[in-house]
């Protein structure tokens, strides 16, 4: 993609097939599903079955803390949802939108570990076309998917917006920013975020074109909740400059976490990642 000239990319985006289809091919890499959801005879209870590729790292006891179900989006797709009760006394629940090359099965162990360490429950979902979710991944479906997840989290579990932390990682920052720009929540965490699709492909892009996809840079200033941005300084996929640019546009930014030497897929392996999240959840949110 980076070998294309600016004019060639403009032609690619502006001519058939439509920009949304181009964006989908470039941004979404759904893996072969690493789990299945089996519904019981009543049609109300779903059982999670993980494949070996999910790399489950805990016992069956921890797995029992995971509740899964399906919900329908405004665009007609059925998406898989996962609620991980890490901490019964948790004040906050993370609405977690994952990266572009994983599904809920692969993320389930990470959710257990993260939630138990920062004292939060975690609600996540698979994008259309990922895991057990129907349909195909697209920018429009991303927004419909997170809307359906937001509604399910609030209605099924009775969790109020002021107790929800909207968390997006990589491509997951796109639906997260869109949702947070429309609804207030306890806070927003953006992990390795992008400013827009064009700016990822062409770092010198200074404005948002009509054919651009995923325009976080134009939406982030509408977020009224506190925003924590986390980015690796050596990110080889989404340059560190994207995190900086978004930080500068925030209405209510908190102290960001720039992880020295971290790339795109290893930020969470650095000790300061968990320390910053613990501080943010346990101390800073209380005073914001």
UniProtKB/Swiss-Prot annotation:
Domain of life the protein comes from: Eukaryota
Matching SUPFAM superfamilies: alpha/beta-Hydrolases
Keyword Cytoplasm on entry: no
Annotated catalytic residues: 170, 235, 264
Keyword Metal-binding (UniProt): no
Catalytic activity: S-hexadecanoyl-L-cysteinyl-[protein] + H2O = L-cysteinyl-[protein] + hexadecanoate + H(+)
Entry's family note: Belongs to the AB hydrolase superfamily. ABHD17 family.
Protein name as annotated: Alpha/beta hydrolase domain-containing protein 17B
Annotated source species: Xenopus laevis (African clawed frog)
